[in-house]
Amino acid sequence: MHKEIGSCGDSAVATLQASAGTNETMGIEGYWHVECRDAQGNLKWNEEFPNLVVAVGKQLMLDTLLKGSSYSVTGPYLGLTNASLTPAATDVMSTIVPSKEFTAYTVGGSAVRGTAVFASSTSTGSTPSNVTSSTATAITYTITGAGGTVYGCFLVLGSGASSTQSNTGGTLYS
């Protein structure tokens, strides 16, 4: 006679792999506030609208801020546009200038783009949803000659940027 002995049992293996994290993101956006005044300084209309910070503008900001190299600001200069544009992240200065730049104006008596002077930034708090902002002082553009329609504005800065109207140098920021 044969004798067989068997055993039985349960075996279980459980593995848990978890990766928890929080995403921290930063968006760059801006708003233009435009006021139109007549020759006597009376407000004719004002408008506020969002602007797009283009890819090359974001790259310039990150390259100068995070790389740690020395950098001095050239500009920023605020130009005006003479055509209705559909902003794209791929826009560069040659997208706008010279064909779409409105040039029938002076700033301080000279036919130049206005220099944007930004204040130190401020923040609404320390939570992830806070808003950090920096505002620029107002620039007065005096429309000359036959005038025309101003459709928008653009900000250019960086190496090669110039206050000279119709100049394509520099990096388009927005």
Describe the function of each predicted region.
Residues 1-151, 157-174:
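Small cysteine-rich, disulfide-bonded extracellular modules of the LU/uPAR three-finger superfamily
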